Amino acid sequence: MSERENLDLQNFYFRGLHPRVFLGTASDRYAGWLGQIYSEERYTDRITRRKKTVGKMSFVEEVLPVDSVEEYFQHFRVLELDFTFYRLLLEEDGRPTANYHVLQKYGQYLKKNDSVILKVPQEVCAQKMWRGGKFVENNSYLNQDIFTRQFYDPAITILGPFLTGLIFEQEYQRKKDRSSSKDLAAELDLFFGEIPQDNRYHLELRTEPYLDAPVFKVMEKHGIGQVLSHWTWLPSLGKQFAKSGRRFLNSGGQSIIRLMTPRGARYEEAYAQAHPFNRLVPSMLHPSMVEETAELMWEAIDNNIRINIVVNNRAGGNAPLVGQQIGLRFLEMGQKI
């Protein structure tokens, strides 16, 4: 085992949990993790402060520089970068966007055995997008050319072997707006049949009725992994997995669990409770989430699956402390097996 692959949960070193376990977080660079993941003295006078409006409330976010990812990967084996969800990497005419340059900067600090998961831009995944104060139809929805040319190709060029997963997240569909699961399955079948074949694709559907046989059949056909998401309007992780017959569908032998928010809690509510992300919020952290995550980790291992656990601050206030709880429960279960 290399020096980086050590295990010390008290000090948030998770890389040595298990060869098939990749525990990490959704986004990084949070100043709230100083003293846990990041060394305080290293970032003196290097913290950027920016305002963020969430719902009707305004918050100040404190963000570390990109080179902090070197320290991040001393603790975690995988990082999900969410900023790619909000903008493509290339403009239509091929010019690099700001996101391209940020991702390129991340790539400069990655080392052997570091692993990055990217969220595919909403311009490709979302049926509707927020424009001019309202949701409007997304004309680029499941556009294979935009996905390939303006995101996939440059992402691979920038990250190379460090890119180990791509998440297609589709927003929750209200009943009056949603199509049938058969129609969605047909759309997905066409899309995944046209884009480059790749065993790193994973699909997160936030509408429970879409966790249905026609959709899972298409996912299995194309080797698309089912993202199990602990999120506002979705059933428990175990129930989501049961809907697919407890099958690991990704052709690359991977699975992704995303711990986003407490079930039943809206984004705005969870963000306000968790901010500034420097402590555990017991009222947010559901014991069942920790329990089910640990159970699924062992189930994946028993099936020779690489399991990626992505923890968001909004799942319990502070992602490293939530990860600590998961790691402890995982090890406890291992002693009983």
At which residue positions do the language-model features occur?
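Residues lining hydrophobic/aromatic ligand-binding pockets adjacent to catalytic sites
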Residues: M1-I337
